[in-house]
Every structure is written in structure tokens, then in C-alpha cells.
Amino acid sequence: MAIYHMQAKVVSRGSGRSAVAASAYMSCSRMYNDYDGIQHDYTRKHGLIYQEVMLPPMAPSEWNDREQLWNAVEETEKTKDSRLAREFVVALPVELDKDSNISLLQDFIKKNFVDMGMCAD
């Protein structure tokens, strides 16, 4: 039986977080943050099953590169307490296979975020 769990967090400069660092961590990748000059390297982190950047139609195509996307967010939001991103942790049903879970998440993200003009990573 599937167990429901969903946790929502805000990535905020006020709490000392960075959208570039959060994206690098979640995608197990290396990214340079133009805002503070820090290189975030999480290439040794394991456990990534799938990654995708989803953009609304009006978003620039260069934002398909997550490093450019999150650096653009960091550049746009200037204040010390800026809310840069939202992070969601969702439990997926173990009864479904990997492809079904990916499709389930893609549909959820598209309907609830991308169709409302937000970028999703």
C-alpha cells in the first residue's frame, strides 16, 4: 500500500541557501554560482534515478541548462532574504515501476507548476 508523504521547503537566501547549490545537490552535478563565486560539486553523490528541467513555453531555451537557469534566478533576486526556489520531497508508490513513477511525477509537475508559468528542475 502506498504511503503518502510530501514535504515542501523554500530555498531562501535568508536561511543561507542557494538555488544553484540546491540544484547541484539534487542533480548530483557540478555547478558554479555566479552570485557568490562558489563551485558546488556533488558529482560523487549517489542515488539519482532521473533528472529533467521542465520549462513553460515563454521561458528562454537556454534555461534548459540548469546552471544557467538557477544563475538567472540568483541574478534576478537581489535582496538578502530572497526566496529563490521551492523544493518538494514526495514519496512515490513502490507498487509502480520506475517509468510509471517518472510519468506520474512529470504529469504532477506539469499540471501544478509548469502550466502555471514556473520552471521545474
What are these regions (language model features)?
Residues 1-121:
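N-terminal nicking endonuclease/strand-transfer module with a His-rich metal-binding environment
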